[in-house]
Amino acid sequence: MRTEAQVPALQPPEPGLEGAMGHRTLVLPWVLLTLCVTAGTPEVWVQVRMEATELSSFTIRCGFLGSGSISLVTVSWGGPNGAGGTTLAVLHPERGIRQWAPARQARWETQSSISLILEGSGASSPCANTTFCCKFASFPEGSWEACGSLPPSSDPGLSAPPTPAPILRADLAGILGVSGVLLFGCVYLLHLLRRHKHRPAPRLQPSRTSPQAPRARAWAPSQASQAALHVPYATINTSCRPATLDTAHPHGGPSWWASLPTHAAHRPQGPAAWASTPIPARGSFVSVENGLYAQAGERPPHTGPGLTLFPDPRGPRAMEGPLGVR
């Protein structure tokens, strides 16, 4: 009986789910980077005030609220730069500062703010009614520009610097926005990793064999071992020569085969029993058969000229009685 065991095949994961997970993992870092770059809208503030001096000079202050690096600052009056305005000063972080009259002094206050002093003649100066604009070029936000003018009701020396509340509020908004985006990204990544880790194992396909197949597979090794053990007893007697025994028997086949019980040939014996069973010699078989004939009262056929009669272990009297003396 031949039985074939089918190995259950593993069901491959769904391609759509795996592809979607891969695309999400690749798109997420780019989304986080874009949100971090664009978090917090950049802003430019401009302040114009009149100093209480003999010449009544004007001071222009500009600042940039953003996370990018500033590469160039341009200050103009009469309108935005390139739209009818006149350039007063150009400030570069590495190449230095260039200014034109009536600008008297331009300098960097911080890395994101500058100041410019203009010479004037008080309230009648044309600078009092004009508009000043500051343009910041930054990376990666780009160019941002804002304009401002002197308030009409401002008195010399009473113009106060801008309150830091809007500046601080813009900085906090940018910091909190970036932090929130990073925190959300980390939580989302952990969620994806945990979901991928706890994904259920692939399901096994049910075997198509009959219910008796496992039982047949279980009995197959035992039947093979029993077939190996069912070996005739005569196969281990390699020292016996059937031709010699047939020659010694004048009446046909050897009688010692018939004397053995028939069920011994089908009795399974283990390897240890075979190894411990001694292989009988030719003389021992003849002795056993002679003893059997002696018990039956007949002359043993193995007492020819080529064979030697071994004495019976019961003594000479037992041999002389049935056989007689010739």
Curated annotation (Swiss-Prot):
Phenotype for residue 233 to F: Reduced phosphorylation
Expression induction: In T-cells, up-regulated by activation induced by treatment with anti-CD3 and anti-CD28 antibodies.
Transmembrane segments: 26-46, 62-78, 172-192
GO biological process, one term: negative regulation of T cell receptor signaling pathway
Sites of Phosphotyrosine modification: 233
Keywords: Cell membrane, Membrane, Phosphoprotein, Receptor, Transmembrane, Transmembrane helix
Impact when changing residue 293 to F: No effect on global phosphorylation
Main location per the UniProt record: membrane
Tissue note: Expressed in some types of immune cells. Expressed at low levels on the surface of freshly isolated T-cells and natural killer (NK) cells, predominantly on CD8+ T-cells (mainly memory/effector, but not naive cells) and on both CD16+ and CD16- NK cells. T-cell expression levels are variable among individuals. Not detected in B-cells, naive or helper T-cells, monocytes, nor neutrophils (at protein level). Not detected in dendritic cells.
GO molecular function: phosphatase binding; signaling receptor activity
Compartmental location: Cell membrane
One Pfam family, short name: Ig_PVRIG
Region listing for Disordered, in residue ranges: 296-326
Any one of the GO CC terms: plasma membrane
Membrane topology: Multi-pass membrane protein
Highest rank taxon of the organism: Eukaryota
The protein's role, per its UniProt record: Cell surface receptor for NECTIN2. May act as a coinhibitory receptor that suppresses T-cell receptor-mediated signals. Following interaction with NECTIN2, inhibits T-cell proliferation. Competes with CD226 for NECTIN2-binding.
UniProt xrefs under PANTHER family: TRANSMEMBRANE PROTEIN PVRIG (PTHR39220:SF1)
Complexes and interactors: Interacts with NECTIN2, hence competing with CD226.
Other remarks on this protein: Was named PVRIG for the homology observed between its second exon and the variable immunoglobulin domain of the polio virus receptor (PVR/CD155) and polio virus receptor-like (PVRL) genes.
Protein name: Transmembrane protein PVRIG
Provenance organism: Homo sapiens (Human)
Organismal lineage: Eukaryota, Metazoa, Chordata, Craniata, Vertebrata
Gene, per the UniProt record: PVRIG
